[in-house]
Amino acid sequence: MSLHRTELGQTGSRVVFCHGLFGQGRNWTQIAKALSADHRVLLLDMPNHGRSPWTETFDYLDLADIVADAIGDEPVTLVGHSMGGKIAMCLALRHPELVERLVVVDVAPVAYASGREFVGYIETMRGMDVASIERREQAEEALREAVPNPVVRSFLLQNFRRTEDGWRWQVNLDLLGEHMASLTGWPGEALGPATYDGPVLWVGGAGSDYISDEHAGEMDRRFPRNRRVLVKGAGHWVHSEQPEVFLEVLRRFLA
């Protein structure tokens, strides 16, 4: 499978970014441009998202292998947020030779109890009468009641694209909705006792509940060289809510 990719920078070590659910590689553009003077940056659209192909199932180990193929043979600093963070962790555990450093953003190597919020988004997006949409403003209005937060609504609508056949969702809503348990889960049993012994930066939003002290034990077991940083004034989307702080933390880790 060939993933859609955007490359920036011509010199320095490689940094690869994996976005989260409903995201695209371009979500990292601001951070990537800032790094591109000193690093070769690769932004990937994850399978079932953006311009990348769709899969028939959702399995973190398979997704990690697909991203590993996209990376190639040269070790990289791998950065992943949320769903992309789980893909990145699985990749580091399965292909440690490809990962020089790992950055995990606001997610832990655990199964989360519920994906109700995400299921609600998917049901709303699937329920939209796409055939009747002529302008993006109509799509935004259709989402307004179920997704009152304008920032989240704008984020979801990045996946709504006009094609020759009219408007459509770029994200594989049917698959993600059907496999929400796998998406919020963690393939710990399938990974066995695997650990990753390289340096790991574990970044969380101080206002998010995706990272907590109760997750630290499993993080320490799988990634014994992790360093945890909480960013004030940020929730789950740390790099979007506090981009300058996130960039500074990342640069220090890369130095």
Indicate where each model-derived feature is located.
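Catalytic histidine-centered segment of alpha/beta-hydrolase-like enzymes
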Residues: 234-243, 247
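Active-site loop/oxyanion-hole signature of alpha/beta-hydrolase fold enzymes
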Residues: 33, 42-80, 87, 248-251
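Flexible "cap/lid" loop of the alpha/beta hydrolase fold
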Residues: 93, 100-135
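Conserved serine/cysteine hydrolase catalytic core
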Residues: 165-222, 227-230
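Conserved alpha/beta-hydrolase catalytic His-Asp/Glu region
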Residues: 131-183, 187
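Short helix immediately C-terminal to the catalytic nucleophile in hydrolase catalytic domains
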Residues: 84, 88-92
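Conserved HGGG/HGGXW glycine-rich cap/lid loop of the alpha/beta-hydrolase fold
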Residues: 6-53
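The conserved beta1-alpha1 loop
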Residues: 18-20, 81, 204
